[in-house]
């Protein structure tokens, strides 16, 4: 009920007292907040800024949401906006509100801080006696006559202020009362007095001793973490003298940090110090022997070479590759022979080559999958013999491969290309530059070009269908590449003889006019050939009966038996009727085609 009554009293102060209905800082209407220690009414925006100042400067409460005590109501009655502004800013013309304060939040905050926190607007000649009469000043005579009574009276007078100071953390009532008496109840100035009094007051010895012991304990804990402090007290003692911890203590303690263990092993020659206890770190489960050499890695695999491999072996590479090195340095006493490296070859199927090579190869342990080849019962040294053709029978190997034996490298010699034989056919033209491939091209008689003789250039007496087109066998030789030994005189016989059954086209243009109708417009006159006279063409045959086709100088089989000829097989180019050796009767076409396919006349 009292809270409700106090809320009504606060609202009456806002409505009845002039100036309280406006904000004390920005003069905005609609106040809903108040700073009860300053005795002013505020708007929402200015109340937010007052909260930023802290409770030691301004204590903000809501008019309707918070509860008000009687002392706080009396405080608001004594001050109000007009009286408070006269005290905090006695010269408003000298310190007016900035014009952009309503729009700029930072400008408004600076103005409020200068007014209440920094107190820049206070008049120097303004004294505390100009306070409202509701706060009577303390008289000197009364305070000197009865100090105990004045103290009790002051506590009763400043009960609200003392409770405020208690809320702010100032628990010494005597100091608080004395500060309030000096400032006539002004909490803000009393706080300043209390702060000044507390800073000038010397610290008690008991507090210093407890602080010193606390510092020693903290320093000892820090030194356990290997952090040295350089703090000295006035008596000359160092912090942590009672808690001296050496570095050996840290070393003797077990550690789980793999990097610290690595540093310890490095400093002690790759050996674990006796002080370090057994650790559960997975990085240091296996003991490390001092001065242990690093194991070599296996090629194309991860991890060291198995320790069972002891003796050394060498792999002799051919000198052609330019490699003469020991690739593997460890092997078992019982060596396993590898297959010797075979040179790459190109061309047809491989032929036995006769050369002798000695590879001294010692394979690593059979546990390595890359070197587990063959049986282990063979000897370490193998004289591999592969049949090369002997030098007496093959010109390619006159400078044959020499067996090197147990030397570090093999001497591969390329064949002497100058001794290369050229297979020249009697009819083929000779080419001195043909060293790599000798191919006999088909030869034609120079006196009988196009299969015709000089005496009979158009093959009047010789049948065209009986002409033979023959070619000499083609010889192709393969050339070796790389370091592979050249092949012996391998030749591929390619028979190319065949019977030509096609019609040999004449060398002239056969544009012929048949029955007054040209094949391609105005036909061209033949120069020397006369098919109707010399070749036995029948010009009375129609142009569209199947014998003659437009655009071709050739003839075809008749589509039907409309044209009847002699029916006898005669010389192909000398028939009175029927075209180009074709029988006039279609019943004999099958035998005629078979004869043509067999190359017979």
Curated annotation (Swiss-Prot):
List every stretch annotated Disordered.
123-158, 289-310
Which gene is annotated as encoding this protein in its UniProt record? ucp3
Task: Give residue ranges for domain Arf-GAP.
Answer: 7-129
Sorted alphabetically, the Gene Ontology BP terms of this entry are: cell growth mode switching, monopolar to bipolar; endocytosis
Indicate the segments forming the UBA domain, all copies: 157-197
Protein name as catalogued: UBA domain-containing protein 3
A single GO cellular-component term on record: cytoplasm
Q: InterPro entries from the xrefs?
A: ARF_GTPase-activating (IPR051718), ARFGAP/RecO (IPR037278), ArfGAP_dom (IPR001164), ArfGAP_dom_sf (IPR038508), UBA (IPR015940), UBA-like_sf (IPR009060)
Q: Show the ranges annotated as biased composition (Low complexity).
A: 139-156
Matching SUPFAM superfamilies: ArfGap/RecO-like zinc finger, UBA-like
Q: Which terms in the Gene Ontology molecular function aspect does this entry carry?
A: GTPase activator activity; polyubiquitin modification-dependent protein binding
């Amino acid at each position: 009920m009292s809270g409700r009554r106090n809320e009504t009293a606060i609202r009456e102060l806002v409505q009845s007292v002039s100036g309280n209905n406006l904000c004390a800082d920005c003069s905005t209407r609609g106040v809903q907040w108040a700073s009860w220690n300053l005795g002013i009414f505020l708007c929402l925006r200015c109340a937010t800024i007052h909260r930023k100042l802290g409770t030691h400067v301004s204590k903000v409460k809501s008019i309707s949401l918070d509860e008000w005590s009687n002392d706080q109501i009396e405080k608001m009655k004594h001050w109000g906006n007009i009286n408070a502004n006269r005290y905090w800013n006695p010269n408003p013309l000298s310190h007016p509100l900035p014009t952009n304060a309503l729009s700029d939040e930072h400008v408004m905050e600076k103005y409020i801080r200068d007014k209440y926190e920094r107190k820049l607007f206070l008049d120097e000649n303004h004294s505390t006696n100009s306070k409202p009469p509701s706060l009577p000043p303390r008289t000197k005579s009364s305070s000197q006559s009865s100090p105990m009574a004045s103290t009790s009276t002051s506590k009763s007078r400043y009960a609200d202020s003392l409770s405020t100071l208690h809320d702010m953390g100032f628990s010494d009532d005597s100091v608080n009362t004395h500060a309030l008496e000096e400032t006539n109840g002004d909490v803000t100035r009393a706080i300043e007095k209390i702060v000044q009094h507390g800073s000038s007051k010397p610290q008690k010895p008991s507090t210093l001793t407890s602080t010193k012991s606390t510092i020693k304990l903290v320093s000892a804990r820090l030194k356990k973490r290997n952090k040295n402090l350089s703090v000295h007290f006035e008596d000359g003692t160092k912090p942590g003298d009672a808690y001296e911890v050496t570095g050996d203590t840290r070393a003797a303690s077990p550690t789980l940090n793999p990097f610290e263990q690595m540093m310890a092993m490095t400093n002690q020659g790759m050996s674990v110090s006796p002080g370090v206890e057994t650790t559960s770190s997975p990085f240091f489960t296996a003991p490390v022997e001092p001065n242990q050499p690093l194991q070599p890695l296996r090629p194309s695999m991860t991890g060291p070479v198995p320790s069972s491999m002891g003796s050394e072996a060498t792999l002799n590479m051919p000198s052609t590759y330019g490699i003469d090195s020991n690739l593997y340095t460890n092997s078992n006493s019982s060596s396993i022979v590898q297959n010797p490296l075979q040179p790459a070859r190109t061309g047809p199927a491989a032929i036995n080559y006769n050369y002798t090579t000695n590879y001294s190869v010692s394979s690593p342990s059979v546990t390595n999958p890359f070197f587990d080849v063959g049986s282990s019962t063979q000897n370490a040294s193998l004289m591999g013999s592969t049949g090369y053709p002997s030098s007496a029978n093959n010109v390619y190997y006159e400078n044959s491969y020499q067996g090197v034996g147990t030397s570090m490298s093999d001497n591969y010699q390329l064949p002497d290309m100058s001794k290369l034989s050229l297979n020249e056919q009697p009819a083929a033209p000779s080419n001195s530059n043909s060293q790599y491939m000798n191919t006999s091209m088909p030869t034609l008689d120079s006196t009988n070009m196009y299969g015709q003789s000089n005496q009979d250039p158009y093959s009047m007496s010789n049948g065209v269908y009986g002409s033979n087109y023959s070619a000499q066998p083609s010889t192709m030789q393969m050339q070796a590449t790389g370091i592979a030994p050249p092949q012996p005189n391998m030749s591929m016989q390619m028979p190319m003889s065949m019977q030509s059954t096609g019609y040999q086209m004449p060398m002239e243009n056969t544009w012929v006019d048949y029955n007054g109708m040209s094949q391609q417009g105005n036909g061209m006159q033949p120069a020397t050939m006369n098919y109707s006279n010399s070749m036995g063409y029948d010009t009375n045959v129609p142009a569209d009966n199947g014998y003659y086709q437009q655009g071709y100088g050739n003839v075809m089989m008749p589509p039907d038996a409309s044209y009847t000829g002699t029916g006898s097989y005669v010389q192909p180019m000398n028939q009175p009727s029927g075209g180009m050796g074709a029988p006039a009767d279609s019943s004999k076409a099958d035998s005629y085609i078979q004869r043509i396919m067999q190359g017979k006349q």
